[in-house]
Every structure is written in structure tokens, then in C-alpha cells.
Amino acid sequence: MIKVLIIVFVLLSLFAGGDRTAKSLMTTAINVTIFAVLIELIYLGFNIVFTTAVAAILITAATIFYQNENNIKTVSAFISVVIVLVLSSFFIAFIITHAHLQGFGIVGDVKIQPSNGYEEDIGINMRLVQVAVFIVILIGGLIDTAVAICSGTYEIIRHNPNANRSEIIESGMNIGCKILSSNVNTLFFIFAGEFMIMCISFLKFYSWSTLINSKDFTQELIAIMISAIGTVVIIPISSYVASRFMCHGNVAD
């Protein structure tokens, strides 16, 4: 069934978008490959922080440059995403450490423990793995927002070349605010759809407080919240970076 869905998706995408969609599909394939290599390297014992940083940069570069080509818009978006990823890494590590989000939760109805045939200690720093997970979750929203702001700012400057830097930043902020609600709603409904069945099954036997304090629920909720925060933070950063790159006659007519 999965193969059928993949084939249907690819055929419909190519029919709807042609060559442009083909590049998007190729970008997705590249990103899946990078993610698979990241998992394998972590499993083999490579430094989690370094491999995740390299993978995040490669995924960002593939998505922005391969799909949208190399120009002043994509360079601005790439730099903005990298800045937010660096800042977010420290914030994510702080949250995971103090919320004790690392480690296994419950897989189905089975808790990860030796009595169930599972090994709790797999020889990997689970705190760093959780940081890597949150960073990977964060990347998509950052890229979409940064590309939208930098592309919009580019068009504004192209049609109004006399705009000063403060006006350009304000325009970028306005663009970001317009797409913010859509991005946050998308993140929320991803979370709501994924955990609807779990919430129903939990509430059948446990209270709301037990549900909210469960590790599985908390991990996913905080991941979505961090993604939403990152989407907000990148708005002023993208606006500023775009203004720095595009303000002094760097935009072609």
C-alpha cells in the first residue's frame, strides 16, 4: 500500500507541476538520504552534535539551493536558517535537559524496559539524540518561512529600489506575520492528528493531568512548540539579513 501511495503521489506531482515538481521530488529524495545517513552515523557512534549539524546544513542547502537555485534570495534565506538553527540548538538543549525529555516513552502499550525484552541502555547519549530530533523537526518550518520572506522582500525592493533599510525590514516583518498563522496552524494540526488516537485511549483509562505529563505527549508537544517559536524568531532575522544583502543595489531589475 505504501508503494502504491508513493507512485500515486509522484505521478500526480509530475502531472501538476512538471519539471518544477520533479526538482521538489528529487530534493525530498536527497533529504531522505541525508536523514538515513545521519541515523546510520549516530548508530555507528559518530559525534551526534557534529553529524546533526552537518546533516542540518546539507538538508537546508539541498532544499533551498537545489530547489530554488543559487541567488541573492536563497543565500539570504540559507544564512537566516543557519543563524536560527545555531541559536535554537542551545535553547533546545536547555529545554530537553530541564524537562527530562530524553529517552524512550511507551511504544504502543509496551514500556521500554528489560522485562519486556527491550534494552534501555543502547550506548548512545539520548539527550543529544533528542536534540537532533528537535532540530530535524525545526528545519522545515524555518526554510519555508525564510524563503517566503526573502523572496517577498526581493520583489518589494525590485519594484521600489529607493526603499531604505528600515522600510525593507518592516516589509519583511509584514510578510512573515501574514504567513505565521498558516505555519503555526499547520504545526498544530500535525500534532493534533498524530496524537488524536493516543489522547482518546489515554483518557479512557487516565486523567487529563496524566496525559499532559506523559513523556510521549510532552515530547511531541514541546517539539511542535519549539518549531512554532523558531518560525516566529526567523521572521525578524530573515527580514534583517535580506535587508543587508538587498539594500544597496544588489537586486537586479
Q: Model features per residue range: what roles?
A:
Residues 142-156:
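Short helical (or helix-break) motifs at transmembrane helix termini and adjacent helical loops
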Residues 157-166:
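Juxtamembrane helix-boundary/capping and inter-helix hinge elements in multi-pass membrane proteins
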Residues 80, 124, 132, 136, ...:
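Pore-lining and gate-forming transmembrane alpha-helices of multi-pass membrane transport proteins
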Residues 1-107:
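N-terminal transmembrane hairpin
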Residues 165-177:
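Helix-loop junctions and hydrophobic alpha-helical segments within the transmembrane domains
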Residues 42, 99-124, 200-221:
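Membrane-interfacial helix-loop-helix connectors in multipass membrane proteins
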Residues 89, 93, 178-195:
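Hydrophobic alpha-helical transmembrane segments in multi-pass membrane proteins
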Residues 86, 141-145, 179-184, 220-236:
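Hydrophobic transmembrane alpha-helical segments of multi-pass transport and channel proteins
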